[in-house]
């Protein structure tokens, strides 16, 4: 199995987009726990912390399908302004926590950050499907990405907790690392044009439906 992974990672551009895709996915396992711990520490309210985490996830769930359809039509670089908006909103959340802004500010920033983040894992898998030729290779690639997801969900929360609960560091340090990983990983990933799947464009049915 290991040799199969090595073989697909040797494909032109494969290792680079897989690695940057992993970095870009780290925030998905760090943001919720980082927000919860930071907000509870500064606002002394698990209720507000839970609300902010819930708003982030709900906003993501509501917009991810729409963003995915637009990526199919216009290509993966369509996500760049949305990723930038998500990062800026996360910075806004960090500033709001630091200066004890009104809870509404936290909720607004959380909604924007979650609603514009999109699914980086889906973009990585789309590149594998475009790059590889055989079903066996694609199956191996998807198995690799599933393992990458597990790495993110194991390492991310541990890293976030260590950062937030380390007294010399600010309580927002978990969010700072998460937004840095999102910005660097996502933009580096999306800048790799050679492995980007071609945009499908609008079909006649989509034009008529106004999608």
Where do the model's predicted regions map?
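C-terminal ends and interior cores of transmembrane alpha-helices
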Residues: 85-101
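C-terminal membrane-cytosol helix-exit motif in multi-pass small-molecule transporters
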Residues: 120-121, 174, 179-202
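Residue-level signature of mid-helix packing/kink "hotspots" within the transmembrane helices
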Residues: 57-65, 153-154, 158
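Cytoplasmic helix-loop-helix junction between adjacent transmembrane helices
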Residues: 109-151
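Paired small-residue
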Residues: 19-20, 104-113
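Helix-loop boundary and gating motifs at the non-cytosolic
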Residues: 2-61, 211
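Transmembrane alpha-helix termini and helix-breaking/packing motifs in multi-pass membrane transporters
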Residues: 155-178
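Helix-to-loop junctions at the C-terminal end of transmembrane segments
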Residues: 62-76, 164
